[in-house]
């Protein structure tokens, strides 16, 4: 049996365009859920976070099962553009990035621990959260790693 990788990075994308295909990929979904449950380190940004949710709902409200690592749903219902530069303060470090999405998380506050502080470019509190469940970190912000080591997020 292959050893677990040291890190799984699920960047953004547009999972809402591939809901049927992602839902049908049961083996991939269960492998990712098992990896996370075994303590694997996962960083999921935007579409990657949506994929880790219990389900993604399309614009009409139809739910498609996803990985179920996070106990929440992403929804495209009532789409609204959210964007801007972000600063994430976590573990004594500051990370920079940006947020660009039309989906939302429901409910926003769930059983996962929310960590860090996210600010706008004007140092105002950003309305989105960074979720942590074990070694899984997931949020809407696409991080810029030229200034900080992504592995430091897990220390």
State where each predicted segment sits.
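Short, small-residue-biased leader/transition segments that mark boundaries at the very start
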Residues: 2-4
């Amino acid at each position: 049996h292959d050893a677990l990788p040291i890190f799984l990075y699920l960047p953004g994308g547009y999972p809402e365009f591939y809901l049927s295909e992602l839902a049908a990929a049961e083996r991939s979904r269960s492998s990712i859920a098992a990896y996370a449950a075994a303590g694997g380190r996962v960083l999921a940004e935007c579409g990657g976070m949506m994929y880790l949710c219990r389900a993604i709902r399309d614009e009409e409200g139809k739910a498609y099962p996803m990985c179920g690592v996070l106990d929440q749903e992403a929804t495209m219902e009532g789409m609204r553009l959210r964007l801007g530069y972000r600063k994430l303060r976590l573990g004594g470090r500051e990370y920079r990035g940006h947020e660009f999405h039309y989906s939302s998380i429901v409910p926003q506050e769930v059983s996962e621990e929310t960590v860090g502080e996210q600010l706008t470019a004007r140092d105002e509190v950003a309305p989105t959260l960074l979720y942590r469940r074990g070694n899984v970190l997931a949020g809407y912000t696409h991080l810029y790693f030229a200034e900080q080591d992504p592995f430091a997020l897990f220390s």
